[in-house]
Amino acid sequence: MSTNPRFDPNFTPYVINSMGPKTPERARVILGSLIRHIHDFAREVELTPAEWMLGVEFINSIGKISTPIRNECHRICDVIGLESLVDEIANRIVTEQGLSPTSNVILGPFWSPNAPFRELGDSIIQDPNPNGKVTFMHGVLRDMETGAPIAGAVLDIWQASANGQYDFQDPNQSENNLRGKFRSNEKGEFYWYCYHPTPYSLPTDGPAGVLLNLMDRSPMRPAHIHLMITHPDYATVINQIYPSDDPHLDIDSVFAVKDDLVVDFKPKTDDPKAELDLEYNVKMALKKHHPNPNSAPPVSSFERYNKAGKEKL
């Protein structure tokens, strides 16, 4: 707390202590810390009434533009790095031997629980785009400690098309285009056809765009493929896979790039169905190593898609 003698040192504790005895303990911890930090923030920058009201109006604008499938507050949390930080806190795994699994990153708003199961070797490309570069993606799931292959894991993949839009953003794409679920085989192997990913901009027509512009930051996301891997015995892996030559890796608008998720796409000459090859191997941690072993991924905007219809996120 600020020690500036101009400010009443008893005010913040008074506000925090106003919480009644029926306040749940975890709520008391979170709200007490929030009040303490936001009061300290106001003192530190000597927030003016006009600046405070500008902030209130900005928060109001977040609610006004949000819809059942456009979660602008989620996007604001992304562009200030809060979701990435919460994800890191929730999923940090390091064993006593210093081993760690493949990195987790944010789920993002475009995951769908409705992606269909497909057979290994199938393509998730349902609506071909003339600019899409078909990629044969393959790899092996292994236990991070023993190196043993992990059979029977579900790999859920989704990506934007070559125009930078996901299926439910684009009326020209059918539902579940560039989405699919696969099961690893007895050798822990997985393989399918997808596209080399395409970079795209976050929507800038709302408060997130205003905030990015105010901070003189790019709205671009580097090209990426989303992957979520689940298994009854292992901690869930949610990540995004980035081409190493993408120019936006260092300026990702949601701070989700991690070194072990940056990969090389290579030319493929032995398969008439693909022009690129991507090998991507994954290390998974048993649930006993996970700080939140039974945590589920957050609800995505897409879960309300079928009721709300197609609308720009």
Curated annotation (Swiss-Prot):
Biased composition (Basic and acidic residues): 304-313
Keyword Oxidoreductase: yes
Function: Intradiol ring-cleavage dioxygenase; part of the benzoic acid degradation pathway also known as the protocatechuic acid pathway. Benzoic acid debradation begins with the conversion of benzoic acid into 4-hydroxybenzoic acid through hydroxylation by the benzoate-4-monooxygenase bphA, and its partner NADPH-cytochrome P450 reductase cprA which act as a mediator in electron donation from NADPH. 4-Hydroxybenzoic acid is then converted into 3,4-dihydroxybenzoic acid (also called protocatechuic acid) by the p-hydroxybenzoate-m-hydroxylase phhA.
Residues the record lists as binding Fe cation: Y166, Y200, H224, H226
InterPro entries the UniProt entry points to: Catechol_dOase_N, Intradiol_dOase_C, Intradiol_dOase_core, Intradiol_RC_Dioxygenase
PANTHER family recorded: DIOXYGENASE, PUTATIVE (AFU_ORTHOLOGUE AFUA_2G02910)-RELATED (PTHR33711), INTRADIOL RING-CLEAVAGE DIOXYGENASE PRCA (PTHR33711:SF5)
Database matches in Gene3D superfamilies: Aromatic compound dioxygenase (2.60.130.10)
Annotated protein name in UniProt: Intradiol ring-cleavage dioxygenase prcA
Catalytic activity: 3,4-dihydroxybenzoate + O2 = 3-carboxy-cis,cis-muconate + 2 H(+)
Region (Disordered) location: 287-313
Cofactor annotation: Fe(3+)
Gene Ontology molecular function terms on file: catechol 1,2-dioxygenase activity; dioxygenase activity; ferric iron binding
Keywords: Aromatic hydrocarbons catabolism, Dioxygenase, Iron, Metal-binding, Oxidoreductase
Family membership: Belongs to the intradiol ring-cleavage dioxygenase family.
